[in-house]
Amino acid sequence: MKTGAGTHGFFGIYKQGKIVDEEADKFVAAKSKSGVNYQYFKPVNKDDGKKHPLIIWFHGNGEGGYKDYQNNVSQKLANRGAVAFAEDKAQKIFGGAYVVAPQADDTWYNNYSKGYIKSVKAMIDEFASENNVDKNRIYIFGASAGGYMSFRMMIEYPDYFAAFSTSAAALDKAAISGGVATTAQDLMKIRNKPLWMVHAQNDPTISYENTSKRVYDVL
């Protein structure tokens, strides 16, 4: 190409290729027979003849679908909740674990009114039966609204899950946003279940005193 100054220059054409996220791309999108959209990861040693634990990750508010828009991807891209368990370090700790991240059609606050409790349980049963899952080692993790969902799943099926962990579980918000109140009587059903709660005392969104601290005091 000759420029106005009489000199010669060159230019190239760049075409954007596929954007690669090595962590997120380890997951595969699926939909259960019960109608739940989810992403799943299978450990590299899944075919070693052994049973492996299953980790369920419940996303927070704002990472579900919205009306007719269901992307089945926000729950793994919004934060490193699910993808962190697919890391080599985490996989080594668990000896190779399956990871499943379901996505609510809207919000987990509607877990009873829209039947998410039962449909998600059916999804877990289906996935576990189709893979080499150790049904004695199914763990729940959840953040914010997903923490609320984690509590409700554990309360409804206390003998099904081995343990659970929550980060700023939105028990207070759920009770006024379409969900149900988690009572002391509810919590007594899971009194002997292993639980690890993570919550900042100065959390400006989810009250530490009204949620994690209250649960700790009851249990």
Language-model segments: what does each one mean?
Residues G147-P158:
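Short glycine-enriched nucleophile-adjacent loop
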